[in-house]
Amino acid sequence: MVKFTKKDKRKNKKLMPERNENYMNNIKKLCGFCINEWHLTTMILPYISKEIENNYKMITILENSIEENIKTLIKKLNLKNEEDILEINWKQSVAQKYTEVGSKLNIIAKSDEKYIILVNGRKNFIDVVNKHIDKWLKKNTKVKQEIKIINCYEITDFNYNI
């Protein structure tokens, strides 16, 4: 018979580091799928417009730029917050190193505003970015505002690894 205990027999040794009791309660992870950049643009634009009206700020980490698609679609739509949407960086992001992702996320730590982090690309790209985001969140446990992380996978390979 095996007995599982939480007690550590070494003196003054904590099993888990102390954290803010609200740690990760303010983080929501969402998932979506798109076929290409145009599909992403038409899918995400109404959602982003609504969330900007709800006082969310936006950070994008994109494998491919969708800036031209956003500009083209905004010209054809009548949105209240066109300027706010165009101010978002819709260009391709370099996200292979933690410092590249961390520098984008440091804006959150300096602010009290709610944020949406949009991550778009193929599975490998999103996996790397999410590791960097998780590492950043563990280092910045004092961040208390609401953060939504939207992972939007680009489905270019149709296989069972999704």
Predicted segments with their positions:
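Non-catalytic regulatory/interaction regions at protein termini and inter-domain linkers
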Residues: 2-162
